[in-house]
Amino acid sequence: MIKVEDILRAYRHGFFPMADSREGTVSWCQPYQRAVVPLDSFRPSRSLRRVIGKKRFTIKINSVFEQVIRACSQPRSTGQETWLSEEIIKVFLKLHRLGVAHSVESWQDGELAGGLYGLSMGGAFFGESMFFFRSDASKVAFAWLVGYLKRKGYLLLDAQIMNPHLESLGAIEIPHEEYMVQLERALGKKISFV
């Protein structure tokens, strides 16, 4: 069973957990190329700026963390496995109760429409996963998160492993060595997420 201390130690050293399936073995990942979102240069796409401007979604923090992480754990398509095992979910629920793991949620018409969750340590936010029930909901939550982190003085938004969706949101890849320098600098800051 993964312990809270294991997670905190791993993240401080550039590792993160990933399961091979819902009930599968948990591995510790430290990719050579790390996906990060440059907070200073982030600019939402024109289409996302239009969606944000329509104010279709209301953003909340930490109001339904467990719902968010469980929605993130659902396979994206039929037959697709998830990397979020029950073991990882349970330890992140503990981290949330300790004030380390957080959710950013998009709500529409009183219903959860999408969102994301991650871990906050010092001036680093480790984005774990996103989901949506309604189109653009997770993108709006993500754009809100970037602005929030900038206002709070965060230095690093770690997106972990690049994929086309993250790339469309402005993530870039940096070498492991550069990531570790940014991580050490960010962990040296004292910032409270909420």
Swiss-Prot record:
GO terms for cellular component: cytoplasm. Pfam families: Leu_Phe_trans (PF03588). It catalyses: N-terminal L-lysyl-[protein] + L-leucyl-tRNA(Leu) = N-terminal L-leucyl-L-lysyl-[protein] + tRNA(Leu) + H(+); N-terminal L-arginyl-[protein] + L-leucyl-tRNA(Leu) = N-terminal L-leucyl-L-arginyl-[protein] + tRNA(Leu) + H(+); L-phenylalanyl-tRNA(Phe) + an N-terminal L-alpha-aminoacyl-[protein] = an N-terminal L-phenylalanyl-L-alpha-aminoacyl-[protein] + tRNA(Phe). Its main location: cytoplasm. It is found in: Cytoplasm. Keywords: Acyltransferase, Cytoplasm, Transferase. GO terms for molecular function: leucyl-tRNA--protein transferase activity. The keyword Cytoplasm applies. Belongs to the L/F-transferase family. Functions in the N-end rule pathway of protein degradation where it conjugates Leu, Phe and, less efficiently, Met from aminoacyl-tRNAs to the N-termini of proteins containing an N-terminal arginine or lysine. This is Leucyl/phenylalanyl-tRNA--protein transferase. The lineage of its organism: Bacteria, Pseudomonadati, Chlorobiota, Chlorobiia, Chlorobiales.
